[in-house]
Structures are given as C-alpha cells and as structure tokens.
Amino acid sequence: MNETEYFVVDTPGFEDEGGAWATFCEIAQLLDHIREHAVIVAIFFVTPINIFKRRPDPFEEKLYTWLREMSGERFMKYVTFVTTFWEAHNPDQLERYNDFLVRRKEQEWARFIKHGAQTYQFGKVYSAGVETTLHWDTDAEQLAAQAREMIRVYCHEIPIIQPLILHELNMNMGLGSTAAGQVLWPAGDGGTNDQGPSRAQSTASSGGSGRPRSTESPQSGAQASTTPTSPPTTQSTGDDPAAPGGWAWFREFAWEITKRYGPQIVEHVINRQFGSAGAIIGGNGGDFASSMQCMSAKGFDINSVTDTAKFFGKASDMGSRGPNGPIGNGPIIFSIKLQGSYFAQFLNRWQNEDIQAFDPKVDAVNDFMEQKDLFMETTVWNTHCQSWYKSRQTGKITALWPGSTLHYMETLAKPRYDDFDITYASKNRFAYLGNGFSQDELNPQADITYYIRDKDDGLSVFGNLFSTYNAKDIGDKMTALADRAI
C-alpha cells in the first residue's frame, strides 16, 4: 500500500491455559526475529463470535490482560478486536451474537477502546440497511475482499511507537520478566523467568516444567555475548579436584554460579545501573528506538542527519540543523562557548530541581522565527548571494542570529524559562528542596559564609551556583556538619 510492503502474520492461537505459555513463546520468538527488520503497524486480536459466552471465563479474561500488557497503553490505539464466524442461521442467533459483542465492548474491551482500540465484525455486511452475514462456503470472494479492506483501513498509518513487548525485548529482558510474560508464566514453575524468546521457546516446547535443559544453547542477543560457555581451564599445580576445600573445587563452584546468575546480573544490575538499555521516551509517548525502527523500515538512514530531519517532516537543509547563532558575523568559538554555557544552565536546573523535561513552546518558537525573518529582510544577507545558511529554494536565512555577537551573548546570558513547558518528575515541584541543606554546606572545603565581606565589591550575593561537587556520601557529610555545629 502506498509503495510500502506489508506482511500479515497469522500467529498461533490460544487454545487453553495449559498451552498458553508455549503459544506466547512462539509469538515472542517471531517478534524477536523480525523486530530489527520490520515495524508492527497493528495487532488484530481475532476471536470467533460463536464461542463467546454471556460472561467470559477466567482464561479469556487472562488473555485480555495479556494483550494489554503485550501492547502497552500507548499502542492500544493500533489494536483491533476482530470477531469472525458471524454466519447466523436465524435472527435470534444473530441478536445473541450482537449482545455478546456489546457486552465485550462495554466491559472487557472498554479499557482498550478508551485508549483508541477498534472493533471489526468480519463477515458482517449491510444490504439496504439490513444487517446480514457472509458464509465461508458460499461467499469466499467477498470475505477475501473484506479482509483486504480491513488491512487497508487499519494499517494505513505507520506508528512511531511499538508494542510494549518490543521495548522490553530491545532492553534484553527475559521473556518471563516482561509484563506479558508475567501474566502467562506457568503457575508453580520454579524455573527462571529471565529467558529470552528463543530459549523460552525451547523450554516450553520440551514439555517439562519450564526449567531450561542443560543442553540448551546460550541466549541470543546481548545476554548471550556476556554468558560464558565453558569454564576456565587454568589449574594451579597441586590442586586436588576432589578436595571440597581446594581451589579447584572453589573454581568449579564459582563457575556454576557465573553460568547460572551471570545473565541476570548483567540484565538487572549492570544494564539498569548504567542505563545502557534504557528507553528514550518523548513527550508524545513515542520512543527513540521505535522511531529508528520506523526509519529503517521506510528506507531512511538512521545515521544521517538529513534523513532524520526528512523522516520527522522537518527541513533538511544545512541551515535547519542547528540553533541560530552569529557565526556569519562573529567568532565561531565564542558562539559555541555561549551555546554550551546556555545549555549547561538547563542541565544545572534539570538536575537540581528534579525536572523531567523542557519542551519549547510552539508559540515562542514561531514568534522568534517571525522576529528573525523581519530582521533579516533589512540585512545584506537578504541580497542575491548564496551560502550554506541560506535556503536555495526559498531564499530564507535560516541559521544566523538577528543581531551582533554581543547581542547574542546578552540574550543567552539568562534563559527564558517562561518560553518552555516544564514537566517535573515529582507531583510537588518543590520536592527538590529535600532536607533543607545546601550541597555547598556538605562540602568540608566550602566557605559557607562567603557573603560576609569587608566592603561592598559589587558582586552578587547569590554566588556561583555551578559546581562539579556531588554529595553522594551524605551520611559522612551530615556527621561532619554536626561536628561543625551547623
């Protein structure tokens, strides 16, 4: 559609709770294989209407919970509940099917629909305002056409976000640790739930208790690369392998611990501690990883500044790739330093005041661009010269500052925070006030009465609020404060 290739994948169906985990493993393994090569544009949850009951049984309710955790709230708008087998033998049967559908929409599917999910009655048609149904045996061509139309209607948009399960797999989470995996994880299973899709599939299909077999290959992905496959062969002279207290015994014991818990340590400690697998979520709910997947699927180069700008619908010319600055009429090094200092003020406030996000207001951006364009009309740059900071198509001057270098410096000296929408990480914007102590007070080398002077020297009493000092060992420093009678 629209020169984009679409694939419809018919995944295994859920028959009963006993085989649910194995089915989920097959679906997850499929997603794991395609996640670097394609974008999920829709999820169709297909259920025959003729198996519905007045009230859903516990397994059906669990499947809805699984679907919710698998898609995630932000992807629910791309979920469609498709009901099939609408062929009814009499009006009463069709009315009963419609009652089942209404109940599902008002109760079990209500949360999905609230977040944008759709419903589709496959096989139901209207003729002259009368509701009728198609039959598999006699209306195959019409049903095929209806299926194609369903795909066209519900898959025309390529989302910038992806199902939650893909985010979790991108973070190298074990399948049983994912939100969806925790819903279907077999009750009473003592095995580890930190297996990847491929390994979990092998375990589930073995028919055992869910514990990994000793002959299984290492997990794929980042965890496999950090999981050794054979113990060290170096052995000290004189070690007795049979001696319980010998070094050889200790090395074997340590190696077993490494093989068993190494992947979990890497996933839950190292990756989480240093943030190497953390998702970057934008204000509209989209995340960076999904955007990059969408770019690749559309043929854009994720390493190209130009392609990135084009993908997000922005101007891709050279002058549109950075902030306006006086680099056409002033020293470039000075401009770069000013921009760095300006940015550092945002970082300082961001970390000190527990701020989650700064988002430039659209009106402020538009007002600045209007003022800049009016100024540029009066300058020499508005003549018929060509330069990298001037669009060849429109003639608009895109990258220069509407003023001199000192004018630029004075403007950036104090950020205009009122031109930004600020989102705080805490419900209370003043929660960052904390325990009432300044970080400078926790520095034993700091002059905490710097404001006492012999004469008025004209300097601000606020002092310099920038510091690389960090009071992480606050316990010791609080003790030092008590010793200094502060």
Swiss-Prot record:
Residues 194-206 have a biased composition (Polar residues). Residues 186-243 are annotated as: Disordered. Homodimer. GO terms for molecular function: monooxygenase activity. Binds 1 FAD per subunit. Residues 220-241 have a biased composition (Low complexity). Probable FAD-binding monooxygenase; part of the gene cluster that mediates the biosynthesis of luteodienoside A, a glycosylated polyketide consisting of an unusual 1-O-beta-D-glucopyranosyl-myo-inositol (glucinol) ester of 3-hydroxy-2,2,4-trimethylocta-4,6-dienoic acid. The HR-PKS ltbA produces the trimethylated polyketide chain from acetyl-CoA, malonyl-CoA and S-adenosylmethionine (SAM), and the ltbA cAT domain then uses glucinol produced by the glycosyltransferase ltbB as an offloading substrate to release luteodienoside A. This is Probable FAD-binding monooxygenase ltbD. Belongs to the FAD-binding monooxygenase family. Its cofactor is FAD. It comes from the Eukaryota. Keywords: FAD, Flavoprotein, Monooxygenase, Oxidoreductase. It is an enzyme of class 1 (oxidoreductase). Its EC number is 1.14.13.-. Gene3D superfamilies: FAD/NAD(P)-binding domain, P-loop containing nucleotide triphosphate hydrolases.
